[in-house]
Amino acid sequence: MIQNVTDDKIQWKCLESKIESQRIHYGRFAIAPLKKGQANTLGITLRRTLLSDLDGICITSVKIDNIKHEYCTLTGVRESIQDILLNLKEIVFKGVCDKTQKGFIFVKGPKKITASDIQIEPCIEILDSNQIIAHLTEPIDFKVELTIEKSMGFRLQNATQISKDSFSIDAIFMPIRNVNYSIHPVEKAGDWKSELLILEIWTNGSITPKEAFHQASEKIMNIFLSLSNSSDNQIQEKSTKNFEEKEEFIFQNIDGFKQDKETKVQESLGWKKISINQLELSARAYNCLKNEKISTLFDLLNYSQEDLLKIKNFGKRSFEQVVNALEKHFDMKLSKDSSKKFYEQLKNLELINNKDIS
């Protein structure tokens, strides 16, 4: 508990900032004084914005000479194609990337290929040039073409190749690795009705936690500024016209509603491609899920919190691991309702049948 806060003006301060590794930067911030309830509202808003609304740069597709599918093997290359794609996925970029960029690797073995071997435009740079991509054990030519993009959030790989000899990969654009917050009571004028918000931010090194904090704050501020810029008179004058425009817009877009639902279904079915390995669970929790035939996030999302606790040998600790991992890696939560809820949501869209989600 923190005592004797007298200033009414909300202030923030960086309590700690350190570089844990080249790809993990940590920052801890304090925001106070806040009225009771404001700290939780602000903490949730900042966390959501940090995890979903900040731009990042990463590789989105890869073209490797003489490779037609990801299960091929290359003579003279120690790693499998899947391993190479995973290594490329982990490379962190920073800089300015207003349009899609191309990167290239042209090397001859034997050689250890690292991120420093990637030829890219000077507007972007690789954070950790020592990241290993592959090992060439024989004197072979190794040629790779990379597509590098800037966006927000993450993008699941396409089910099919983008073009001949080219593969899309799961692109994680978000520069934020994790965000935690905690709320502490503060004494002010003899009572404990004020609160202090502690915010912890881990980034991938492409931006500092302080930069991430500023960017998220600006995005939140811009949202509220857009709401406050219109006066009551302006709102009153436009209300009738806006209603008519919205009514016309709604009826014009009825035909497009089915297409929107199809998009929602495709996004939902994309979770079938993400293995529960990505949750980094303990062996016990992982084996319990596998025994229950839960292999992907899509499978897991069809279980409610209550359903998970009913799984044989699946205790409270394993349950907490799954819940925390879902929130940490994908900012998702399991439903508290029936285990069939996720399936039913897809079925209710009237665009899929049991065959689509089996």
Curated annotation (Swiss-Prot):
Task: Give yes or no: UniProt keyword Transferase.
Answer: yes
GO biological process entries: DNA-templated transcription
Q: Where is this region: Alpha C-terminal domain (alpha-CTD)?
A: 266-358
The enzyme class is transferase
Region spans: Alpha N-terminal domain (alpha-NTD): 1-231
EC number(s) stated in the UniProt entry for this protein: 2.7.7.6
Keyword Plastid applies: yes
Please provide, alphabetically and separated by semicolons, the GO molecular function terms listed in this UniProt record. DNA binding; DNA-directed RNA polymerase activity; protein dimerization activity
Q: InterPro entries in the record, alphabetically?
A: DNA-dir_RNA_pol_insert (IPR011262), DNA-dir_RNA_pol_RpoA/D/Rpb3 (IPR011263), DNA-dir_RpoA (IPR011773), RBP11-like (IPR036603), RNAP_asu_C (IPR011260), RNApol_insert_sf (IPR036643)
The record's catalysed reaction(s) read: RNA(n) + a ribonucleoside 5'-triphosphate = RNA(n+1) + diphosphate
Q: Which Pfam families does this entry report, sorted A to Z?
A: RNA_pol_A_bac, RNA_pol_A_CTD, RNA_pol_L
**Gene Ontology CC: one annotated term:** DNA-directed RNA polymerase complex
Q: Which UniProt keywords apply?
A: Chloroplast, DNA-directed RNA polymerase, Nucleotidyltransferase, Plastid, Transcription, Transferase
Q: Where in the cell is it found?
A: Plastid, Chloroplast
Q: How does it assemble?
A: In plastids the minimal PEP RNA polymerase catalytic core is composed of four subunits: alpha, beta, beta', and beta''. When a (nuclear-encoded) sigma factor is associated with the core the holoenzyme is formed, which can initiate transcription.
Mind telling me which HAMAP family this protein's record contains? RNApol_bact_RpoA
Similarity-based family: Belongs to the RNA polymerase alpha chain family.
Tell me, what does this protein do in biology? DNA-dependent RNA polymerase catalyzes the transcription of DNA into RNA using the four ribonucleoside triphosphates as substrates.
Q: Read off the domain note.
A: The N-terminal domain is essential for RNAP assembly and basal transcription, whereas the C-terminal domain is involved in interaction with transcriptional regulators and with upstream promoter elements.
Output this protein's name: DNA-directed RNA polymerase subunit alpha
- What is the native source organism of this protein? Chara vulgaris (Common stonewort)
User: Encoded by which gene?
Assistant: rpoA
